[in-house]
């Protein structure tokens, strides 16, 4: 039976940053994700292997990719970066080239180095899917966020999205701010001003008290203590009071506005614990959507038509 998927036509379908995708390609991926959600089937005609290389801790992204791969009938090879030959001095390139030589058909990589993929993209002949690079980019998270917003509102044009929190260290913020702007949304930023480097002057700044009355979508970000080298000047309580989504602030949001968060969530820091699963929260919906989005991305990577 024919499956109603749209087809791409490149020969090597890397997914490194959202800026590498045209708006048409984004539309194709969201379309294919919806087809998978609706029960459509796709699997490769031959046995294909996908290697997951994670050099940073991950729960949602790693498991979501593995579930997506298995649902597509792919053979999954999980490589623990902390136990790989990289710990013996092997370069990331040599590790990737080794897996390509062994017969792996695509690589899913998360790495702590910003833009790690620059040394790989023109030298590795199999598709590379970026599962997060340092403070740089997280394209599959951005795609699942876009799909979640599209499901909710059916549009991006003039939609007001406030991205709030640790923007300086967030690969999610960068991917989403750039792409939502390309799609016609109105993006605002919020949070501690010292964490707005690279954003302030590009996107308008609002306080959280202003954001809750303005936004259609509030996208909260975790305070990434591991990237601050112990320099965070806020206590959890003071951050929550000044910059977090408190119960009182949530009550002032527009009736149809939603709350998003890429997780992991620091309860009672960026968001009150009782709001994590409140009616306007889409946090666990985002996680659910990650599987179909990653199925669509894997299909794109492994399709030669």
Swiss-Prot record:
Q: Name one GO biological process term.
A: amino acid metabolic process
Q: What does this protein do?
A: Catalyzes the condensation of carbamoyl phosphate and aspartate to form carbamoyl aspartate and inorganic phosphate, the committed step in the de novo pyrimidine nucleotide biosynthesis pathway.
Q: Which catalysed reactions does the entry list for this protein?
A: carbamoyl phosphate + L-aspartate = N-carbamoyl-L-aspartate + phosphate + H(+)
Give the matching PROSITE patterns. Answer: CARBAMOYLTRANSFERASE (PS00097)
SUPFAM superfamilies reported for this sequence: Aspartate/ornithine carbamoyltransferase
Name the family: Belongs to the aspartate/ornithine carbamoyltransferase superfamily. ATCase family.
Q: State any single GO MF term.
A: amino acid binding
- Assembly information from the UniProt record: Heterododecamer (2C3:3R2) of six catalytic PyrB chains organized as two trimers (C3), and six regulatory PyrI chains organized as three dimers (R2).
Q: Which residues cross the membrane?
A: none
Which positions in this protein are listed as binding carbamoyl phosphate?
60-61, 110, 138, 141, 263-264
- The name under which this protein is listed is Aspartate carbamoyltransferase catalytic subunit
Q: Per its UniProt entry, what is the enzyme's top EC class, as one word? A: transferase
